[in-house]
Amino acid sequence: MLHLITPLLLLLARFSMAIDISDEHFSAYPRMKELIGSHLVSRTEETPPSTKKITWYLKITDSGSGSPKDDTFPSECPKDSQLCGLTEISLPNRDPVITEVFSFSNKLTPQFDVNTSSFIVNLRGANWGAYTLDAEIEFVCASDDNAEGLKLVKFDYSTVSLQYKTSSACKSNETPPKDGKNKAPKDDDSNSWGVFTWLFILLVIVMASYIIAQAWINANRVGSSHEFLNELVESIVETLTKLPEFLREIANKLFTSGSRGGYSAV
């Protein structure tokens, strides 16, 4: 009987943890294990004469780990919370007072949305009195230099949006983008050389066609294959003789037009 109860308890434990990196959706992110535990982010607002501070606590677990790290939340958060928000009001010369508690139970089923350089965990349907709250937690692949940790993007008493920029959110085969952006690869010399190579090949084909056509026309007047070969050789020599002058004229036109176009009237 015991061997049937143990797997059942493990299965129930897995379904009672929403952000659980043992879930198959995290299989492409092996470094997410580095984020196991509790994380928090706070935002403070001046509301004279008081000060309002809201703090969000996020718990990331691993039910498949033999020794899971379980950092506890503040006592004001319900025990089954895996995302919890606390609003604290402070007045001069008085102890802070907790006025609002937002809790996302670990019984909520997460929904996953994978983008190019991030993935989002959505938690929907948390109860807060007569209201319903949703949570959006975005994990962004970032280099260690651009990592920002947990960040509160938005909270409007309807949806809370959190963002976590870290290299731990990168896929196993993904390189963190520099400056937080996926930059387009720079043009290298091989691309430009390819253009000039094709232009050179095209020029050679045109010249060869011109030489053969000219030799063929001249040879038809005589009607001898021997004369055709002579005409072909003469056409090649004549074309090669005129080639330097032809290239010089093209270069002069290019550089002359380029220097004139470099200035504008003021």
Swiss-Prot record:
InterPro entries referenced in this protein's UniProt entry, alphabetically: Autophagy-rel_prot_27, Man6P_isomerase_rcpt-bd_dom_sf, MRH_dom
Cellular component aspect of the GO annotation: cytoplasmic vesicle membrane; Golgi membrane; mitochondrial membrane
Function: Regulates the cytoplasm to vacuole transport (Cvt) vesicle formation.
PROSITE patterns, sorted: MRH
Species annotation: Pichia angusta
Name this polypeptide is given: Autophagy-related protein 27
Subcellular location: Cytoplasmic vesicle membrane; Golgi apparatus membrane; Mitochondrion membrane
Family of this protein: Belongs to the ATG27 family.
All copies of domain MRH, residue ranges: 19-172
